Regions:
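Short conserved segment of the HATPase_c
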Residues: 90-102
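Conserved glycine-rich
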Residues: 131-132
Length: 158
């Protein structure tokens, strides 16, 4: 793991991946409102987390073109990377189960060729390595928001 300035990292990630996701019908953008929000993480694992989330957004989009936005924000003690899409969201009773390995919301949402489950248990495991956490909720009128919460690397948290 190393120090990563999350805003810059996400900007670079979006630049590197925007065409790939566009080809899969997902418009990707970022909104970064922080400067120098530094976390300790492994860049390859962090990339895997973001790809995992966006692959789901591309897979479950409701229209020909879906949209995902990655926001980077912070408060006194944490830095947040928030990925929101405009897909179908998840039934409320399934939200707490999403983190289980291989859990699928329902068979109609998934195509057998598309791999096993949402892969969110991998995200939770990786965020555990980063001493962070994952919060998932639905957005109105529809969509899913995945909040990646990282402890802030700073003078107060050494």
């Amino acid at each position: 793991s190393e120090e990563i300035e999350l805003g810059k990292y996400v900007q670079g990630f979006v630049e590197d991946h925007i065409e790939h996701y566009k080809s899969r019908g997902l418009e990707l953008s970022e909104r970064i409102t922080v400067k120098n929000a530094t976390i300790i993480a492994n860049p390859q694992l962090l990339q895997r987390v973001l790809q995992n989330i966006l692959n789901n957004s591309a897979k479950y989009k409701m229209a020909d073109i879906g949209h995902s936005v990655i926001d980077v924000t912070e408060d006194e003690s944490h830095v947040y990377c928030v990925v929101s899409d405009d897909g179908p969201g998840v039934p409320p009773e399934s939200l707490d189960r999403l983190m289980r390995p291989f859990y699928r919301v329902d068979s109609s949402r998934t195509n057998p060729q598309e791999g096993s489950g949402l892969g969110l248990s991998i995200i939770r495991r990786i965020m555990g390595i980063f001493e962070g956490r994952v919060v998932i909720d639905n957005i109105r009128p529809h969509g899913l928001r995945i909040i990646l919460e990282f402890p802030k690397k700073g003078e107060n948290h050494e």
